[in-house]
From Swiss-Prot:
The keyword S-adenosyl-L-methionine does not apply. Keywords: Acetylation, Disease variant, Disulfide bond, Lipid metabolism, Lyase, Metal-binding, Mitochondrion, Peroxisome, Transit peptide. Changing G203E: In HMGCLD; complete loss of activity. The active site is at C266. Homodimer; disulfide-linked. Can also form homotetramers. Pfam families: HMGL-like (PF00682). Residues 1-27 form a transit peptide. Its main location: mitochondrion. It comes from Homo sapiens. Mitochondrial 3-hydroxy-3-methylglutaryl-CoA lyase that catalyzes a cation-dependent cleavage of (S)-3-hydroxy-3-methylglutaryl-CoA into acetyl-CoA and acetoacetate, a key step in ketogenesis. Terminal step in leucine catabolism. Ketone bodies (beta-hydroxybutyrate, acetoacetate and acetone) are essential as an alternative source of energy to glucose, as lipid precursors and as regulators of metabolism. This is Hydroxymethylglutaryl-CoA lyase, mitochondrial. GO terms for molecular function: hydroxymethylglutaryl-CoA lyase activity; magnesium ion binding; manganese ion binding; metal ion binding; structural molecule activity. Belongs to the HMG-CoA lyase family. It catalyses: (3S)-3-hydroxy-3-methylglutaryl-CoA = acetoacetate + acetyl-CoA.
Amino acid sequence: MAAMRKALPRRLVGLASLRAVSTSSMGTLPKRVKIVEVGPRDGLQNEKNIVSTPVKIKLIDMLSEAGLSVIETTSFVSPKWVPQMGDHTEVLKGIQKFPGINYPVLTPNLKGFEAAVAAGAKEVVIFGAASELFTKKNINCSIEESFQRFDAILKAAQSANISVRGYVSCALGCPYEGKISPAKVAEVTKKFYSMGCYEISLGDTIGVGTPGIMKDMLSAVMQEVPLAALAVHCHDTYGQALANTLMALQMGVSVVDSSVAGLGGCPYAQGASGNLATEDLVYMLEGLGIHTGVNLQKLLEAGNFICQALNRKTSSKVAQATCKL
């Protein structure tokens, strides 16, 4: 870690030069991007070995100290289905709640929502998909039936003054159906928005998307849902996560999901990369002169901490590069 602290300033000295490069040919980019850190939940949920509650709490606290304004904390799902998230209440109650930072939690059903609120949650997340077959295989119902389940959560959230964020899985491709129609993604996203989700994250669940596919999908969705309500969630399975994110930024999206150290593999492509690494995202955004509010040095330290705890190498290219110097 000490070597990384010394190496970082030299490694990142080129950022000033990068900021000086004109981005006029890239279209209008947002001046500020909100990063939604999903590592503690999406990144850890499929870990085979149970991560201790104190480690999860320390990771989230370190991410808060790094300046991330939204940190997806845990999932209020049955431990029978996701053992890794069995300590959801202890984690949510145990973390430091930094002023100005949101700590949303996943709630797949009304029972999970009620438990989350009882534990102090102020924002919850619900998951849908743009693929009928994916929905059927994952939650054993149709897309329309899934929205009937979400309706109970959204109504309860409205009564309790709880914000709800939606996810649309398979926005750029499905492991079962293959290509997904942009019109279908737009339809599902519009439904989430009309039901009360303040923000909808469009997920490339298996990482097959390319900038061209991203552009076509967003073009369709933006005709149905306000741009300010959209976010993107890219996986790096085919090495396209940053490229797809940049395309979304060029189209005006200013909310991006990512995971510290790139935690979270793709369950449909064994050995493949998973979530976009937050470190790599921050490095790119800073190079474009886009404000994130994130301290990259502290973020790297958080990534190093969790990788040591998991006894694995980081998937972040920025972390790998700075540690080699």
